[in-house]
């Protein structure tokens, strides 16, 4: 980053007030606490516009540094067919659009608000995030899964919740909890099977909780929706990098 900063100012001009370290801290603080740019400017002694510029500059540099990892998890090229994978969807609140058509697309009936869905695929052995996909809040979890996994080998095994009923038709080795019906209650073996799947799947839900320690994901997203995917993908890269 220091090299990029020197290159940015190689033609001279006024030197930046912040060091590379402080710029990085400001960027991480923005993701972690989701301060306004005005608040960040006051904390670091710069104006609001410069706080915005430095965060966008830092985001661009980090996305270049993590380019290969970003490609791996967005294209799902590191999914190992010999391992089991856990899949889950979390929703992040976004601002309501003035356009009624867009409102309907992003409205989540489950959350009763406008959201973007993030699908996380985690390797059960390595605990790393190996796949990520996004869609509007109105899209069903299983539809998001089908749309994002069209290029994957059908021999891959996924563990999913009851929202993914029918996944075995696409990935035959996959498992979902058994459902009871009015005339077919669950046997003791079925209950033990469901408990086993839940105990394994809890790991991916813990990952979602860890990602949402970044308040930019847990609070309503205030920026343009076009920037959301890169931001969320970078946070997943941070998680993988720290393992």
What are these regions (language model features)?
Residues 1-17, 114, 184:
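Basic, low-complexity segments
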Residues 30-32:
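Short amphipathic helical patch at the helix-1/turn junction of helix-turn-helix
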Residues 23-27:
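Short alpha-helical "packing" element that flanks the helix-turn-helix/winged-helix DNA-binding module
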Residues 18-20, 34-243:
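Short, well-ordered secondary-structure "scaffold" segments embedded in the functional core
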């Amino acid at each position: 980053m220091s090299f990029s900063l020197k290159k940015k100012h190689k033609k001279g001009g006024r030197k930046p007030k912040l060091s590379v370290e402080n710029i990085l801290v400001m960027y991480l603080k923005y993701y972690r606490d989701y301060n306004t740019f005005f608040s960040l400017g006051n904390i670091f002694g710069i104006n609001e516009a410069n706080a915005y510029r430095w965060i966008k500059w830092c985001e661009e540099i980090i996305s270049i540094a993590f380019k290969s990892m970003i490609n791996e998890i967005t294209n799902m090229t590191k999914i190992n067919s010999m391992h089991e994978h856990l899949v889950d969807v979390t929703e992040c609140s976004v601002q309501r659009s003035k356009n009624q058509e867009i409102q309907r697309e992003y409205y989540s009936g489950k959350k009763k608000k406008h959201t973007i869905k993030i699908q996380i695929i985690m390797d059960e052995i390595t605990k790393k995030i190996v796949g990520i996909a996004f869609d509007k809040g109105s899209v069903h979890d299983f539809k998001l899964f089908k749309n994002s996994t069209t290029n994957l080998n059908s021999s891959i095994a996924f563990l999913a919740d009851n929202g993914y009923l029918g996944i075995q038709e696409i990935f035959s080795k996959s498992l979902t909890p058994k459902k009871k019906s009015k005339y077919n209650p669950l046997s003791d073996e079925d209950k033990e099977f469901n408990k086993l799947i839940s105990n394994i799947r809890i790991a991916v839900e813990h990952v979602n909780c860890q990602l949402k320690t970044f308040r930019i994901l847990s609070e309503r997203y205030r920026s343009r929706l076009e920037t959301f995917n890169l931001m969320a993908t970078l946070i997943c890269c941070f998680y993988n990098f720290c393992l």
